[in-house]
């Protein structure tokens, strides 16, 4: 991944903005990955495709959609879902200056709960510090482990 500023990423997003607003949320996961998620990762955030392994086998849990590689480490796993999966949390449930705890997210969005559990299982299997989920339109990230905290507190 090359260095970029938030302004450069925003300018890159603006070039692709119509793709996001016009996307059919009933599309399947593969189409969501091709048209939205890959656009964010490779065209907007400028990750190199050689730094991302797709469908990486993670022993028993299954296959991680995106595993990011930096040197010999895997710093991030991202689990993809189709655009129609909603990770919605009611605006009055959250504070703008604090992260959303997993327990609130799980209560408000079963789709987000199931995707985060899946991503955390993959990340834990690979020894990855961060896990994320996306439907191409919403992106959520968490630490896979924080000493002294349960998953509900993260």
Q: At which residue positions do the language-model features occur?
A:
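A short, conserved, highly charged catalytic patch centered on acidic carboxylates
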Residues: 1-130, 138-154
């Amino acid at each position: 991944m090359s260095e970029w500023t938030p302004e450069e990423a925003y300018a890159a997003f603006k070039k692709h903005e119509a793709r996001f607003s016009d996307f059919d949320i009933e599309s399947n996961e593969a189409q969501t990955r091709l048209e939205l998620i890959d656009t964010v990762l490779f065209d907007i955030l400028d990750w190199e495709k050689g730094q991302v392994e797709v469908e990486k086998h993670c022993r028993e849990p299954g296959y991680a959609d995106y595993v990011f590689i930096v040197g010999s480490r895997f710093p991030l796993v991202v689990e993809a879902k189709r655009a129609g999966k909603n990770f919605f949390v009611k605006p009055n449930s959250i504070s703008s200056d604090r992260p959303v705890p997993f327990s609130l997210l799980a209560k408000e969005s079963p789709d987000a709960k199931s995707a985060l559990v899946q991503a955390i299982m993959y990340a834990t299997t690979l020894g990855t510090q961060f896990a994320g989920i996306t439907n191409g339109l919403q992106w959520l990230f968490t630490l896979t482990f924080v000493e002294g905290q349960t998953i509900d507190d993260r």
